[in-house]
Amino acid sequence: NEITTEDENSNKTSDESSDKSQDENNNTGDDNKNNNSLNIQDRNCRIFFFDSNALKLKYIDTTIQVEDGAIIKALTNELQNTNHNDDFLTLTKKVSIKSATIDMSTDVLEVVFSDDYTKYMTLGTATESGLLSSLICTYAYNLGVNKVSIYFGDELYTCLRGDLPEGYFNVDYSFAEEYVKEGIDKNT
């Protein structure tokens, strides 16, 4: 009843909700010395970021490279990327994904981080909540689920809520705004 989307040993199974129109990327060998065993695909996705100046959730539609079906790892790497906008709060690079699974009986995506990212970041109430929103919205949107649980090792992360009786966060990204770089008119 579970689909494993990734694990720490890099033995991943395909995610049933993955986009079937993905194109395989031609790897030239510059990216990885062991490129013969990698399956790298380009995937269109939506990344949600918290704008720490405007205190709003924004999103960017982009294409990312996914190695061996590790979509959560690839999405997390993009959430650690500061290239989009200096005002976007990005996840520290001091943590990584240990595993990610979807429980098909409950439709809950469980994401396990290597460590507590809040230990490595200076976060206030709004920014901690905003960072959590960017994580769960990015994961949920791209995997087609609406419930996400975050773990630091085997400890359930509850953010500022103190307790999560259901064991997961319900995801709502309907209030997010599309990010448009200044000087770019999307209507042309």
Region roles according to the model:
Residues N1-T188:
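Bimodal "functional hotspot" detector
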